[in-house]
Amino acid sequence: MSTIEARVEVHDADILKRAREVIDDCAGLQEVGREVIAAVDLNARWRGEECINLLAPEAPTSPGVRALLSAEIGTRAAEGHIGRENRWFAGTRHIDEVESLCVELLKKVFHCEYADHRMCASMIGNAVVYSALTDVGDTIMSVAPPVGGHSSNRRDGPAGSHGLKIVDIPVDSVELEVDLDRFNRLAPEVRPKLVALGLTMALFPFPIQQMAETVSQWGGKIFFDGAHQLGLVAAGFYQDPLKEGADIVTGSAGKTFSGPQSGIILWDDPSITKAVTDAVFPIWAATHQVNRVAALAYSAAEFLEYGEAYMNQIVKNAQALGEALQERGIPMLASHKGFTRTHQVIADVRKFGGGLEVARQLESANIITNKNLLPTDSYDDWANPGGLRIGTIEVTRLGMREEEMKEIADFIARLLVQGETTEKVGRDVLRFRSSYQTLYYCFEHGLPE
């Protein structure tokens, strides 16, 4: 019989080996359980209390959201649509209350006619869209990864697995916006059934209205994948895709929206409702983590109360951080146009060793970022691309403002530009971070002073 080491393994074999050694060294299974808890606690202390977390796809949830994620209701099954006649299981009347509150709150937050809350991740929401609105062999258009596109709308994600032909949306690699003239020439040639506007490097709005006018000539639809921008959309600090001509919107509740990890689907057109909801259930969701749904409803209520102030500060912080990094010798994309209109900025760190090396160096000093492709990179540069993606969601929720962004830029520049040691900078990061331990823009702690 083959050993684990001899098998094909996608995970890091050394880390798995250490895990097996921990299990084998434990006196009993209760001790194994304590090891799991210990690892979780270590992460909570390091990432939750000691790090400057600048990952664009992360957001810390409020105490109320975290409490609901561990609620008893999470052990209950709720297969199907809301309502006694729609459920397979009995005993769901209070679950119906929770789910209906969630749906109506989402519709209120996003000013839309329909909302679905049942996806555990926004990528699954994207899969729903492709299942509902396309057929195998259809052509779609989406953004290529080097200029910001995400895999879920490409060949190696749900779009590709659905058997779709994928054509690149032309993007200006300097302006980091859709090249509308080239799009208007290309789209009529390929006649996409769906145009997927999804970005992992999401800095600026799309010309949705103009693109929708073009594809409507042959019945094409616009799909806005707002995984990163969802909170900004809700608060009015980013374009409203549905109002500008998008037919359907997906998004992640766990990024700018700052709720539990969830996928959200939004639309206004009743003619697509059956196709979308049939794809949600029974294709992509059965029982759907009602504890998560409760937490999502709670976070939507929080967002209605605090979202505008929160998103406003997130964007201000991102623009301030981009400017501060540029001033300290770290080249930033789109510096000629204010760096960003969202929570993200992108650094060109090729001269400092590339995105992988820089992210590792910053991590050693308790500053958490991620490597990112630049428009000048190729697909072959994925392992060590030239860019670094930086986000301001978490630092904003901890009460930081523009002045703190200058301090964070100082830490990064001390490492990359001035060449100080990670040990020295890391100690200063710990001292800095110790002053920011309260999460704001939530019912428990309100707004920062």
State where each predicted segment sits.
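N-terminal glycine-rich, Lys/His-bearing helix-loop that initiates the first secondary-structure elements
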Residues: 1-86, 90-101, 213, 434, ...
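PLP-dependent enzyme catalytic core of the Aspartate aminotransferase-like
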Residues: 2-11, 104, 316, 381-449
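Conserved PLP-enzyme active-site core in the AAT-like
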Residues: 6-12, 17-26, 94-97, 101-331, ...
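Short Gly/Ser/Thr- and Asp/Glu-enriched loop/turn motifs at secondary-structure junctions
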Residues: 49, 120, 291, 337-343
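Short, well-ordered beta-strand elements within core beta-sheets of diverse protein domains
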Residues: 54-58, 344-351, 396-397
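Flexible, glycine/charged-enriched surface loops at secondary-structure junctions
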Residues: 82-83, 287-290, 307-313, 325-337, ...
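Conserved small-domain helix->loop->beta segment predominantly found in fold-type I
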Residues: 300, 311, 315-360, 368-384, ...
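A common structural junction motif
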Residues: 364-369, 416
